[in-house]
Amino acid sequence: MEDLVVELGERSYPIIIKKGLINEVNLEIQKVFKGKKIFILTDKNVGSHYGDRIKSCLIKSGYDVKLMELEPGEETKAFSTLPLIYNELLDFKITRSDLIITLGGGVIGDLGGFAASTFLRGVDFVQIPTSLLAQVDSSVGGKVAVDLERGKNLVGSFYHPKLVLIDPNVLETLSERFFRDGMAEVIKYGCIKDKEFFYFLKSLKNKEEVMNNIEKIIHKCCFIKKCVVENDEKDTGERMLLNFGHTLGHAIETYYNFKKFTHGEAVAIGMYEISKIAENKGLTDQGVSEEIREILVQYNLPYEVEIDDSSEVLDTIALDKKNIDNVLKVVLLRNIGESYLEKTNVEFFS
């Protein structure tokens, strides 16, 4: 599979997608890092599969390596986790000439990337995403953040990695639920940018067929995202389209205190619900929400939810970063593969 490059001038970086890459991390790191110390941040689940393997191969290449394992789950991506990471970095005497590796899913990538961006005003880092969601979405584009009690990603920055290493083989150790979680983001790309890709995903009959095409799928998603990021790095226009389903999805995650739905499951619900609302308002072609519902059902993803206190959800939506001066930009579809921004307000969802 051809390597991709996110073209951002001096901050450009490659995305390498290759089966078996997890066993060649040291070779790729040597191409971008000439220092001595490497700090690996992971969680206990991922660490049990790949932590010692990667640490050992880096040590054999002459690096001084420290591995830190955190508890898995969204609760770890909290502001309060940062001092724990900073203290480990200080104990290891990491300097700005050293390297941080984030080995894990979106939580570790976001959390570790934000720690890298803020420690000593910035330490280089490399993303090694191990979940499908992180491989197709969160590892690319330089958005790093932590959560606050009142919402997701409320403290963050734009800080790009030096390199993204994607090994589709690591998905074999991913649970079925989190594989489906990632497929929600895959489906999103078809919804917003590529009708042909959407129907290709619909044509796949089962997980075996998906896995037989997984490199192609990951490559397509990363290609779409890298093109969008190159055109709108700081999320002021086109890049907002990548948030299709996320405004409502983030609110649903927060409403259930990040315990009932995974990120992808919440986004799946958000994509269907906002399309249904938009159809009723004449802003989306009729039948689009049904197409989305069908593909979500096909991939065993939820598409609707009962909310007892809608005011709480609306309060969370009001905190969305796309809500500026009480003008909320929501991402809608005209049709499958054709997305746009609609200026409205929080009442759009009521």
Swiss-Prot record:
Pfam families: DHQ_synthase (PF01761), DHQS_C (PF24621). NAD(+) binds at residues 106-110, 130-131, 143, 152. Pathway: Metabolic intermediate biosynthesis; chorismate biosynthesis; chorismate from D-erythrose 4-phosphate and phosphoenolpyruvate: step 2/7. Coiled coil: none annotated. GO terms for molecular function: 3-dehydroquinate synthase activity; metal ion binding; nucleotide binding. Its main location: cytoplasm. The keyword Metal-binding applies. It is an enzyme of class 4 (lyase). The keyword Protease does not apply. Its EC number is 4.2.3.4. Signal peptide: none annotated. It is found in: Cytoplasm. One of its GO terms (biological process) is amino acid biosynthetic process. InterPro entries: Dehydroquinate_synthase, DHQ_synth_AroB, DHQ_synth_fam, DHQS/DOIS_N, DHQS_C. Belongs to the sugar phosphate cyclases superfamily. Dehydroquinate synthase family. This is 3-dehydroquinate synthase. The lineage of its organism: Bacteria, Bacillati, Bacillota, Clostridia, Eubacteriales. The gene is aroB.
